[in-house]
Amino acid sequence: MSIVNLVPLTIGVFEGLHQIHAHILQTRFKSDTYILNTLLVMYTKCAHLVDARQLFNNMSRRDTFTWNMMLTGYAKNGHADEAFRIYEQMQQQGKRDVVSWTALIVGLVENGCGEEALEIFSQMQEDVRVMNALVSMYARCGSLDEAQQVFDNMDIKDVVSWNAMIVGYADHGQYAESFDDAQQLFDKMETKNVISWNTMIGGYAELGNSDQCGSMKDAQQVFDSMANRNVISWTAMIGGFSKDGDGEEAFSVFNQMQQEGIVPNTITFISILKLCASTAALLAGKRVHAIINQAGLQADISVGNALVDMYAKCGSIVDAQKVFDKMYERDVVSWNAIITGYAQHGLGEDALQLYNQMQQEGLSPDSTTFVGVLSACSHAGLVYEGLQLFNSMCHDYSIIPTVEHYGCMVDLLGRAGLLNAAEGFIRNMPFEADASIWAAFLGACRIHSNVKLADHAAKILLRTETQNAAVYVQLSNIYAAAGLWDDVEKVRNSMKDRGVKKEPGRTWIELGDQTHSFMIEDRSHPQSEKIYAELDRLGKLIQTAGYVPDTRFVVHDVDEKLKEIALCYHSEKLAIAFGIINMPSGTPIRIIKNLRVCTDCHTFTKFISKITGREIVARDSRRFHHFKNGLCSCGDFW
């Protein structure tokens, strides 16, 4: 047990404190300010002020905490004169702060020295630095009324005073009136510094496109009005545009920032890497990685973790592993990022190997780790291993399962066809299943064509998810595959009556420094004629190779030929054709889709990978699919 741990155990035990003190003086900790401060706390709490003062006098280095602790000890134990003397010494050395003032005032009041307390309080009000600290303390704690009261009563205010209030209101700007107050204060400021401007940018960026107040348009106006911007200003804009879903503008700001000679910091890089990850912009991510290396930040653990996450989410688990292997230091976040990456790519056994390696290296898994490994088991169909891990999480690590863990287990059992077991798992949960769990169960019903259970799950989902188009689409697909066209029509009418619109499928593909987007039957692209011609050519080749369109989930009761035509020009097919036209032979094609890839597009892509000899990596809303030589890494199980 360390000395720091031993000291608190001796509270109230005078001999124990003396023994610890004597031991400290014989070790390398005899000049350690933190250790000695801890001992000083114990002496003052036990009211051993003679020993506390002796320790205080013998300390070679004293910080503000040391002085405040000695002052507080005297004040709380009725030694107002000694407390005042310490206070005067602090004043001479510039050590006093809001804690010093408060401790002295409380001590004087408790000892019946009301006049002296009022005099000190008057002096305190004249010290703008201390009053600023008091405003800031209230604001950080969310006590905005108290902060405003202190602020209003200040005779002298500087830019720090105003900033403290603006930061307080902006930090609580999820409430419209709070951010309005921040804006009003900002407008009243005669002198603004970079902190003032950055606070407003950060507040607007956090709000995004809120209808209540604030937006990235407002943030841009504030940003454009700044005479001097620093790295925090630029980073706030990047983060705001990223959160707002405007990746193009975020990348533009990042590029402009560098052109103006502003060196990105760790937070900037993490923010832009998250954007690359969310948009699967692998080439952009690699360029950012190169800039990180030039800046000498590749050894930063937070940046390393963001790089692992970015590469995994961009479809390059190989690059993610390379970054992970080169990290000088790894924490549980590092391991979680690589484990989750392998899980998303359907490489369950690799994820489990990493999980075991993590433990061998002395790191304990946390709640997020288990979400990753349970998801890995689900994607890989490792039912037995998943059940073992769930039990281990509860019994070996005392981690209470969350809705995410239960969702993984329902997904695991459901994908494996154990639908009754999955439903039983839901019913035995210690809390009511939310929409995500019933959605996982509905997805399993689709995979295994269980109309009865799907109908049951959908009814439960639609009690709360009346505007969730995905539920209607899933149910409609299940009915269509079973040939229940009357039920398909009922679902369609229900969507129409409730004003629910299906999110249109969209697929993105990165080429050079540009990202190209496609929708179903999209003819807006400049290369549209070439893309459609290439798609027709590929269609003939794969039909010769044995491809048969999968029309089961076409939700229209029409002729089979019309169903096949409806499948021809899905967004992912257009993106793949574009990639084949524009990328050198043998180059992997990477696409990202906002929805789950349909069964026909999945089959189509397997055949394309075979006849072209290309690897095609597709990220949909569920997972990654690696198509190679006519096979998919998901094993047709998604």
Predicted regions and their residues:
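Terminal (and in a subset, N-terminal) low-complexity or junction segments at the ends
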Residues: 1-638
